[in-house]
């Protein structure tokens, strides 16, 4: 079969494109997904779960060999040791990130998209993208000019009656601290706290593949979904991309197509381009890859949202009670830091009442702090070798802009006094600065040993107060207290630099931009510059990461580009 469209990656963007492009019967559409299928009626229980921790920590659903650095790399001191490599969970399953993520369904600030257009992505301002945000969703709670009512992805908020005791205490505390209550996170964009919007219906995740690749859509004879299919090479005739080579369940295959669309995410899409000789010329020559098209921006200016947490021990009455809801995040807040020219609503706090799948995780609640409008954009993706089977080298360089570090320290110092509120005092104790360290990741690995060990530790934590204090200080805490962060600038900076991690919102490595922008990889329709028949459609085309969890912006972008393609054809 000669395909009209070959989509490399069946994630959030790929699922949308597969549905929309195959809706026209004359289009033959192939989706190549390296991971497993999530067929209707047979979606793994870990994926369906409202609590996502058993999905995103499961090696079955991720690129398990992917490691990245997050700390800033010194370019002044060539002898400085490289920061430690950390695991970075990226989905390897139909539905992509939407199959394993925290199900957070938000859009960002209108100013984010006006900035996209200002940076050269013509036609991507807020007014132009809002119709596609509405098109993708059915909001189950609100029906007004901000919301969609017949899209494939349901959006809702967990009702207050189903919140954990911890969430209720935070609600009271935010109110007493004079933060404004907003019933709708996705309504008019302003500072305040709100029930977080989630892509979930009747206590089950609804991923992009579940929403867009339904049983009815899968019956289309012109749509071909090939899972367990690793694309190993892009095929070219001169500067036209004409197909892909792939391993389908281990067997070599070749597929030809009129247009190839990379939807492999902000780490793997640029890697596909560079292996094909499209990217920074010097880097390609170093690896002996013949240069097909020099594009300096491929893999450059990688972004994510820097994050740290303040955790605390939860009394039994405050924990997630799995009967009504397994959701661990009920409330969020955005506020304006007013630091370093940051726009309004630049900071985001999400309140979690469970921090891992195991028994100790159930005893720990946290404020997760995101720099939602980050200024750090010096990360990069490079190849380690020309081989398709070797993961790329990924350096996020989080906090490369000092303003991001200052805003995280400021956030910790704003939140710490809230633990003195009577509502928080009644349900939490032992607040401490926390990080998603390798130690935490190891204990979070899903296996019998961790289940047994955390079961024992949890019983001890629920024991006498002196024992709990000892265990938290010696096993859960870093080597710094909340008091020290609040009172010592040097200690605060050292902790945040070491502890800050990204929140799986990798973006911007194949940015859209104007014709005269030497760092623009794609035009405003995702078409790769100087190469015919090749597009990128995923979070890597964002000109800058929006002030949002990136799943809905990615789905929106795929909806918008799919509409453009169908209009053109």
List where the protein language model places each region:
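N-terminal redox-cofactor-binding region of secreted/periplasmic oxidoreductases
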Residues: 1-569
């Amino acid at each position: 079969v000669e395909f009209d469209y070959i989509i490399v990656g069946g994630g959030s963007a790929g699922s949308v494109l597969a549905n929309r492009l195959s809706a026209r019967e004359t289009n033959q559409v192939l989706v190549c997904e390296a991971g497993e299928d999530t067929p209707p009626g047979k979606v793994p229980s870990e994926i369906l779960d409202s609590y996502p921790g058993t999905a995103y920590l499961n090696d079955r659903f991720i690129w398990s060999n992917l490691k990245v650095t997050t700390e800033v790399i010194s370019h002044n001191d060539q002898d400085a040791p490289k920061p430690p490599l950390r695991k970075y969970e990226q989905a390897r399953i139909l539905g992509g990130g939407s199959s394993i993520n925290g199900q957070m369904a938000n859009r960002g600030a209108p100013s984010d998209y006006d900035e996209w257009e200002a940076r050269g992505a013509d036609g991507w301002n807020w007014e132009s993208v809002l119709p596609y945000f509405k098109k993708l969703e059915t909001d189950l709670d609100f029906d007004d000019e901000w919301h969609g009512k017949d899209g494939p992805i349901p959006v809702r908020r967990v009702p207050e009656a189903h919140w954990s005791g911890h969430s209720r205490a935070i609600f009271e505390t935010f109110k007493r601290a004079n933060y404004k209550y907003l019933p709708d996170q996705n309504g008019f964009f302003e500072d305040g706290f709100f029930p977080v919007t989630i892509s979930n219906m009747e206590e089950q995740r609804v991923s992009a593949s579940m929403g867009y690749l339904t049983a009815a859509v899968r019956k289309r004879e012109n749509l071909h979904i090939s899972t367990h299919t690793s694309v190993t090479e892009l095929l070219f005739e001169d500067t036209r991309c004409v197909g892909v080579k792939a391993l389908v369940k281990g067997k070599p295959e070749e597929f030809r197509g009129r247009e190839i669309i990379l939807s492999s995410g902000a780490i793997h899409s640029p890697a596909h381009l560079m292996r094909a000789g499209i990217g920074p010329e010097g880097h390609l020559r170093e690896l002996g890859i013949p240069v097909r098209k020099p594009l300096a921006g491929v893999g450059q200016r990688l972004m994510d949202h820097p994050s740290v947490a303040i955790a605390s021990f939860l009394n039994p009455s405050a924990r997630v009670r799995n009967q009504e809801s397994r959701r661990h995040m009920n409330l969020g807040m955005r506020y304006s830091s007013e630091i370093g020219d940051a726009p309004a609503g630049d900071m985001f706090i999400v309140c979690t009442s469970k921090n891992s799948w195991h028994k100790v995780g159930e005893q720990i609640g946290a404020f997760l702090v995101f720099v939602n409008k980050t200024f750090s954009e010096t990360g990069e993706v490079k190849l380690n070798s020309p081989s398709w089977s070797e993961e790329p080298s990924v350096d996020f360089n989080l906090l490369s802009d000092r303003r991001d570090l200052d805003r995280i320290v400021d956030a910790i110092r704003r939140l710490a006094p809230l633990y003195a509120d009577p509502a928080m005092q009644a349900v939490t104790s032992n607040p401490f600065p926390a990080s998603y360290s390798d130690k935490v990741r190891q204990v979070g690995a899903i296996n019998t040993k961790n289940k047994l060990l955390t079961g024992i530790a949890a019983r001890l934590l629920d024991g006498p107060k002196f024992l709990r204090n000892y265990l938290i200080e010696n096993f859960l805490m870093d080597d710094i207290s909340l008091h020290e962060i609040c009172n010592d600038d040097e200690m605060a900076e050292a902790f945040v630099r070491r502890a800050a991690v990204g929140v799986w919102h990798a973006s911007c490595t194949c940015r859209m931009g104007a014709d005269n922008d030497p760092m623009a990889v794609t035009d405003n329709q995702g078409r790769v510059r100087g190469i015919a028949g090749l597009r990128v459609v995923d979070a890597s085309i964002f000109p800058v990461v929006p002030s949002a969890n990136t799943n809905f912006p990615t789905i929106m972008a795929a909806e918008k580009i799919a509409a453009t393609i169908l209009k053109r054809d």
